[in-house]
Amino acid sequence: TRFRNVTGVQTCALPILAAYSLHTMSGRAPRVLYAFFLMPLIVPAILVAIGTFLLYAQLGLNNTMAGIVLAHATMAIPLVVITVASGLKSYDMNQEMVARSLGASRPRAFLTVTLPQIRIPVVTAALLAFITSLDEVTISLFVAGGDYATMTKRMFNALRDEIDPTIAAISTLLVALSVALLAASQFASRGERR
């Protein structure tokens, strides 16, 4: 759970700022950067896992918490960028401009005007990052181990090595958690529209 919590928090800061920057930029640069942020979705997960393993072997990050969190965050970043960018499309930037014309700095205007108005996409993005980390088994098989084996890796190993009803119970709980988070997200977005 600690991997998913850290991944959820770490994954949201950079992509939220990236989506905001892409939204405010003009020209060709936003399209190129947007494609860059989507690369982990475009490349097959097994190739990302092998590449991550080889890179981590050279850097000494295999079987470390920092390595696992970084790998999980890399896989979740595209989902956060897409979700926040779609939320920013319906946001009127004139509101932030007004705040800045009244003396607020750009960071203060973003934190006090823009961020509260895009909170539903931000919360949804955080939940997606959490669920992505929860579900990411391919990369975990390559970079996690020892004291830092993720729950999904332990479940995969248990399914492979032993027959235990605990895995079925945990899987049911994970599905129920995912459905509950999805329902909460839908309920929150309906409340926001009204």
Residue ranges with predicted function:
Residues 73-74, 80-88, 92-93, 106-135:
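Transmembrane alpha-helices
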Residues 1-12:
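Single conserved hydrophobic/aromatic residue that forms the stacking wall/gate
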Residues 49-59, 127-133, 160, 186:
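A structural signal for multi-pass alpha-helical bundles of membrane permease subunits
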Residues 24-33, 61-65, 106, 120-122, ...:
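Membrane-helix interface segments
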Residues 85-96, 100, 104-115, 164, ...:
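C-terminal transmembrane helix and the adjacent membrane-cytosol boundary/short C-terminal tail
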Residues 29-30, 46-75, 107, 143-146:
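Membrane-interfacial helix termini and adjacent extracytoplasmic/periplasmic loops
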Residues 17-51, 96:
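Cytoplasmic-entry segments and transmembrane alpha-helices of multi-pass inner-membrane transporters
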